[in-house]
């Protein structure tokens, strides 16, 4: 490419310096002495920006892929159904246990009710008035009432 250069005297002179457009063209040159340093700097910066943009794009792709991988954890789609199953099983177990305990309580209650009824019947039988026995007990209590209370309590069976 042809360039015009200003000399110190202020005249324009025709200058023929090679001006490569890419780094590959710059690499094909035999010598870098004829190439302006600003052109070299511009080409290097341009290529560096391209490489940085490619690296950044690859890094963004990698980060988005990692984000998708974290979201697509194999167990995550089964977590909610497993929690629901766990809660359902726990509920069934609690209801079953409550029904079993209620049945045991009812069975124990019926056995105790029959035992209480039997004891009440026995108590009624024992408390029924018996003519011969009551007269003897009444006589004994009248005789025993003349003694002090502590003698009746402590020595009632020894006489």
UniProtKB/Swiss-Prot annotation:
It is a single-pass membrane protein. It comes from the Eukaryota. It is found in: Mitochondrion inner membrane. Residues 96-159 are mitochondrial intermembrane. Residues 102-124 form a coiled coil. One of its GO terms (cellular component) is INA complex. Residues 19-77 are mitochondrial matrix. Its main location: mitochondrion. The chain crosses the membrane at residues 78-95. GO terms for biological process: mitochondrial proton-transporting ATP synthase complex assembly. Residues 1-18 form a transit peptide. Keywords: Chaperone, Coiled coil, Membrane, Mitochondrion, Mitochondrion inner membrane, Transit peptide, Transmembrane, Transmembrane helix. Belongs to the INA17 family. Component of the inner membrane assembly (INA) complex, composed of INA17 and INA22. Interacts with a subset of F(1)F(0)-ATP synthase subunits of the F(1)-domain and the peripheral stalk. Component of the INA complex (INAC) that promotes the biogenesis of mitochondrial F(1)F(0)-ATP synthase. INAC facilitates the assembly of the peripheral stalk and promotes the assembly of the catalytic F(1)-domain with the membrane-embedded F(0)-domain. This is Inner membrane assembly complex subunit 17.
């Amino acid at each position: 490419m042809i360039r015009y250069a200003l000399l110190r005297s202020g005249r324009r002179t025709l200058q023929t310096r090679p001006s490569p457009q890419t780094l590959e063209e710059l690499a094909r040159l035999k010598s870098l002495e004829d190439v302006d340093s600003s052109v070299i700097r511009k080409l290097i910066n341009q290529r560096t920006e391209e490489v940085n943009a490619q690296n950044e794009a690859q890094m963004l792709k990698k980060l988005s892929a990692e984000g998708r991988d974290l979201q697509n954890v194999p167990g995550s789609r089964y977590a909610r159904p497993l929690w629901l199953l766990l809660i359902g099983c726990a509920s069934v177990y609690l209801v079953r246990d409550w029904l079993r305990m209620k049945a045991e309580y009812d069975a124990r209650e019926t056995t105790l009710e029959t035992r209480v009824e039997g004891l009440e019947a026995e108590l009624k039988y024992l408390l029924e008035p018996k003519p011969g026995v009551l007269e003897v007990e009444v006589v004994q209590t009248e005789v025993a009432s003349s003694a002090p209370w502590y003698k009746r309590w402590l020595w009632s069976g020894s006489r």
